[in-house]
Amino acid sequence: MTKKSQENISLPQGVLYCWGDKFSGKPTFNPLIPNICFMDNGYNHSLALTETGELYGWGDNRHHQLSSNKAITSIDKPIKIQVIPNQRVKSISCGGNFSAAIMENGLLYVWGTLIEGGKCTESPTKVDLLKGVTCVSIGINHCAVVADSPTTPEKRSVYTWGTNRKGQLGVVGDSITNAPRRVTLGSKAISVCCGEEFTAAIVEGNEVFVWGYNKSRQICSNNSDEIISIPVKPFLGRDIVELSCTKNYIAARSGVGNVCVWGSNEQVCRIGDDKFINFPNKIKQISASTSHILVLSEKGEIFSWGNSEDNQLSHKLDVNSSPNINSSSGTTTPTTNTTTTTKKSTLQFNNVYQLEGRNVLSVYSWGKSSGAIIEPGNFRVDIAESMRRKDNIGSPAPLFFRKLVNYLRGENSKAEGLFRLSGSMARCDDLEKRLDSNEIFPINKYEPYDAADIIKRYLKTLPEPLLTTQLCQKYEKDILNFHNNNINSNSNSSNPNNNNNNNNNNDKIENLILEWIEKLPLENRQLLIYLLSFLQEISYSQIKYQKQNAMGEKNLAIVFAPNILTRGEIGNDEIVEDMIRLLPTIMKQYPLMEDLIIIDQAQQCLRGSRIPYIIDHWIRVTKERETANNSLFKPEIIKTIINSIVECTLEIKNNQNNQNNQKENNNNNNNINNSNNNNTNNTNISPTTLSPSTLSSSQQQQSTPSSLTSSPSPSQRNSLSTGNIANSLSLSSNALFSPNFLSSSKDGNNINNNNNNNNNNNNNNNNNNSSNSSSSSGSSLSSSPNLSPTIVNRSGYSLSFSGGTPSSRDSSVNNLLNTSGGAIQSIQRQFANSGSSSNNNNSNNSPSLIGSNSSPALTFSNSSGNLIETTKLYEKVLALILSPVLPIGSIMKVLPSIFELDTNNDLFIRLLTTIKLVRTVRSNLDEFIQQQLVMIKEINQCSQFIDKAKQLNENVESVITDLLYVDESIKYWKQVQPLIQLYSQQIQSYFKWWFDLLEKSMTETEEKLFRAKKEFDKLETEKTKLEKQLNHLNSVTLETTDEQILLKKQFDQWCLINQIENCSRKIEISNQNLSRVNHDYCSIQSHFEAFKPHLLIVQEFVSIILKSVSLYIEKLDQIKSNTLQMFPQYFNAYIELIFTHHHEIKQQQQLSIIKSLAHSITLQHQLLFIENVNQSKYQISLELETKFNSLKRVILENLKDSR
């Protein structure tokens, strides 16, 4: 049992590796334990804490130390322990059969049995006498905490309770106490740590106090008393910041990162041997157990020494080495030679070599076991471990694997010999290193063959094969035997049962593969299906574009079989080929994988050259796999697609605007240089000598109007808009105005594409450092609504920006436009001044404004060819998921505006899911029927009928299908029309709400500006009047010598001067107020003008969408009305035509024509009089039905006779 002085748990979260007793001899990932940031161990139970404050426990529960309602002897898998609802756990401790947790509010809860034979606390119970608890530690039968003590000079003290047989409570006597008692230390307590039967504490100044059982001299090496009840200092001036206590010794860490151990333990330390141990690097954490110690350096190295009977040290040692004692410095420096593996005790530290290079977060030792919390790795670790990374949770494969896969999509999928030809070894090593370290970098500099090699290398170097060794041994031979049976059957061509045997074998192969996949661990299964789906993509692309040497399913199976099946085996590639072939069947069993794969494709492939590839892929797979067709229309899929389209569209627009701004800035700089050359004799250039077009953006901002008493000029408004607002305007933390961003898994897009865009952004940023580019954007406000777009970073968490523009490593866009302050603050001030108390109650009902100066529409110029091309591709993407009833162009146009208000994002997604792609009726059905009727009437001879029979049948079937669907379609669109109206009008209402709010704010601020200007003019007038009076008084010469008159004049002068000075101060204050109000007005005006086009576009969109749905319903009603009159005539002509020529066709023995007629008429009968009898009775009279049935009987008899 190990106890550590732990004040607050603020460690990063990772996976748990264990080694030693009951574990393997080397550090091994423990998949049963969730991601944790801290753990502690009692005698036979353990507690673990996550970074979100959730508590887990496992082990012995006979004393309810796991807080389980049932006294289960042992719990093997971690269970979640709820201390109190809606409260996070901040720190934990367990010892003996007792557990404790400090909550985030500083209260302490305990459960279990603290004192042997004492009362058992079955559920977490608050310790009432303690508040402000910061640290807790538990021994065998006693507990110690650091808590607030406001009535003492120290203000924070150590409190103990439990048994005191060995003096561990810090008071005289051996009584048992159940109530916390304060221990007198004389200084403010920082942390506390319990050994089995003693207690240690660190106080202010990093001094150590120890008390309790001293048999091993761990309390005081020069005191032979077995029990020391009064706290004593074992030494002075050691600067101790962390303690770890066990049964008979204490380990301590100093502030400079050295370790000191004292007490008596022949495997770790000896009495009197309390010198500091120096390590190659500074130590940041220690953990001591009964017989060994682990320490962690700042570089992530683990050093250990002590007993290694159960391989708990896990390192190699030279058994002949011994510590080197430096007598001059008083320190011990053990040697670090490693030659052989040993299980003997050693006082020499060495590193745990199996974890070299891993990012170790914390270490733990207990009993004869060791553990470490480690950041989940990528390469050469279990798949289950790598999927514990934050960026992999909820994904079908590790992030780096998905990046490689997406890089190989598109044009790279056509590379000849992909996965067969090798890449550069040096590039592959570099690529693996960068992926393993989670570096964000452009992958385009690597060849497709390099990425393909890394995929194979990753699968090959997994600790065990993807399909697991155990399952490979169980299924591989059986499946291969069935394949051999097929080969033997095919070689024996004389056997008439070959086909049946092969079918039986294939069924058995399919069943075995499905059973195999079902038994795989979840992470392995998801990665396998993701890989099979990708290999199927590569196979299709290779066969389509590589006529020779294409990497089809067979060739890919040959390459991948050694990497995912039994290693070293050959001839098992047929199994992988079968798995690729069975992908549609596999997807039916695991439809969620289809969702995850499409989401991944939508996030990564809807940009650049991969857009046509993914469109073609989605069209193909939706035809091949029903699961893909179903997934593509799910709300979360549509939401992901829309998010990706908006982000990429705004990204492209932003890059183009940046390029245009850069060119404009360069031209402006050239103009300024020319102007400077023309005015070399002038030391100062007045702003009035330069036109606004020749001023750089920075100069426009620095030049101020000579008088603020007048309204700002357009150029001044531009200088105050966009760019300045981006840094001065900030959305308040008030819920009414705080922006909430949509989440999407746009993880590190820099790694795979848009290299050129990123480089352009970087160049633009560098070029714009010397001059503010905001004026260029601002100038567009007065010219057109085509503004610089807001690039919204949508990461895994909601973001709220205030102040300066933040930087994000997850976004491929370097500049995030930030809205803030003036407009919104002004609005808030108005709400505050109005004394409204309902803001908090209504905050959730008010929309939040995301962007201020973003592009209200995608307007294209000759220079935006890339955007035009991309937009056309996006329209094709939307056409895959949205109904053609609504114009896709209108949707693309409104997208940037929709994402201006975060409240509308969800509404817009709901709207799109409502109008998702459903079957539509032919818009010119009545005209088509009329054309077919004319064609039937033109057929006079049997030869003509034979030539057109197939086309006639298909057209009749198509007309019947559309005709019967008209009623269903009308019903569907009338049902969804209110929802469409609700969502679209609600979107418009939010925009109108913001528009009205901004307009109102602008009006009120304009009134404030007028009043401020009026006040300023009034003060100026008053000052001028006083100055005139003073000048007049000064000009009057008094010829009298009367002292009283002279003194009165001086007094009048003094009064006027003071009044003028007072008035000047008021003018200065008024001028500042006028400047502020003027700036707010310009900001709100800019915001208003930027938002106005968005409202117009949204209003236009809502009008179009409502009108489109209404017109479509009207069109359906018209089609229904027209076809009710035309279809009977058309269908009767079709029947009469067949009656006219069927006898001649029979005589000519046109068996194919008779079969075609029989099949078509049977299908028509099924549609009209079986499946849709209720609808068809409105279109077909009883007489026509009788005639059709007669025709059916005749054609079927002809078919029977012909056979």
Swiss-Prot record:
GO terms for biological process: signal transduction. InterPro entries: RCC1/BLIP-II, Reg_chr_condens, Rho_GTPase_activation_prot, RhoGAP_dom, Ub_ligase/GEF_domain. It holds the Pfam family RCC1_2. Keywords: Coiled coil, Cytoplasm, GTPase activation, Repeat. It is found in: Cytoplasm. CDD domains: RhoGAP. GO terms for cellular component: cytoplasm. Residues 316-343, 657-725, 746-789, 831-852 are annotated as: Disordered. One of its GO terms (molecular function) is GTPase activator activity. RCC1 repeats lie at residues 52-104, 106-148, 155-204, 206-255, 257-298, 299-359, 361-410. Residues 320-343, 746-788, 833-852 have a biased composition (Low complexity). The record marks R420 as: Arginine finger. Residues 381-594 form the Rho-GAP domain. Rho GTPase-activating protein involved in the signal transduction pathway. This is Rho GTPase-activating protein gacGG. The lineage of its organism: Eukaryota, Amoebozoa, Evosea, Eumycetozoa, Dictyostelia.
